[in-house]
């Protein structure tokens, strides 16, 4: 079987793609890790997954990791301690992404799937220009597009899994509060159920990219599972777990970058014009999850 090399395979996005590739069974996944001795790497090895060591700051290690791969799923992490807060603008993330593109080009990768985000500075016409973890990915995307490497772009929203992975719900005596910085009750959020939908979208692109009629190469695909106001989400969770869940709007997160991100999402919206579910991905066979399905599968077992 052809090989797809997956970066971030021990994180939220890469693991979603890895699991979907394994379930699909048409490609052999190769996971990339900075350490083969980490618990996450050992868990993948125990499952029979090939895990190779590479560092996004080391182009030669990236070339070795990609050697013989038909495809790659690429993602970078602004919050990586090697990137931030050493540099508040996280320019190292751009270096990492460009290194990955260069390595993919050198190794003749036939299909590069990049996990990106819209450029906040450009789409807000300069109103929000400090959301570096968003803009950096868009800058890398531009570099990929100019590189000549055959590619497609996957765009994600707010991770629905943040509800439990980042502790968005706070326990109270009677239930939970759902505090969100910068968001008002009427503001809409666009969210991605990463573990359910991102991998499915990646596999759909991977399975169809060689067919010109599908229009995949060079295209962008927002992977938006659901849209909601936070009071709507809180109400749905409350009904499912039979406990009080109250949304509260916070004036700040304590970090300018995060405040600008949430205000940008709330006031302008990364995906205001993207229908849910994305018809381009539905046409490729992606079956998106719904907010209700996400709550039943991921929230109820943890909070009921």
Language-model-derived ranges and their functions:
Residues 1-2, 304:
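Universal eukaryotic N-terminal targeting presequences
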Residues 51-54, 243-250:
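Short hydrophobic/aromatic-enriched beta-strand-loop microsegments
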Residues 44-58:
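Rossmann-fold cofactor-recognition segment
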Residues 213-216, 241, 249-304:
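A hydrophobic C-terminal alpha-helical subdomain
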């Amino acid at each position: 079987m052809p090989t797809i090399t997956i970066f971030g395979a021990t994180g939220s996005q890469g693991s979603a793609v890895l699991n979907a590739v394994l379930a699909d069974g048409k490609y052999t996944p190769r996971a990339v890790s900075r350490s083969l001795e980490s618990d996450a790497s050992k868990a993948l090895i125990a499952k029979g997954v090939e895990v190779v060591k590479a560092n996004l700051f080391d182009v030669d290690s990236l070339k070795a990791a990609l050697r013989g791969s038909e495809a790659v799923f690429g993602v970078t992490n602004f919050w990586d301690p090697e990137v931030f807060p050493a540099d508040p603008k996280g320019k190292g993330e751009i270096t990492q992404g460009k290194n990955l593109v260069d390595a993919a080009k050198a190794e003749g990768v036939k299909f590069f799937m990049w996990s990106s985000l819209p450029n906040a500075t450009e789409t807000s016409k300069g109103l929000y220009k400090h959301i570096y973890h968003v803009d950096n990915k868009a800058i890398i995307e531009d570099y990929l597009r100019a590189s000549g490497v055959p590619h497609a772009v996957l765009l994600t929203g707010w991770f629905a899994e943040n509800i439990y992975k980042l502790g968005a719900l706070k326990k109270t005596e009677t239930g939970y509060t759902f505090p969100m910085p910068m968001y008002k009750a009427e503001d809409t959020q666009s969210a991605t159920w990463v573990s359910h939908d991102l991998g499915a979208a990646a596999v759909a692109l991977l399975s169809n990219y060689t067919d010109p009629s599908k229009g995949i190469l060079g295209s962008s695909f927002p992977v938006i599972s659901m849209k909601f106001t936070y009071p709507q989400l809180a109400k749905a969770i409350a009904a499912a777990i039979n406990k009080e869940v109250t949304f509260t709007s916070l004036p700040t997160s304590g970090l300018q970058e995060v405040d600008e991100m949430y205000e940008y999402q709330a006031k302008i919206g990364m995906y205001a014009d993207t229908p849910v579910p994305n018809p381009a991905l539905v046409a490729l066979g992606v079956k998106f999850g719904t907010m209700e399905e996400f709550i039943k599968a991921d929230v109820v077992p943890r909070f009921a």
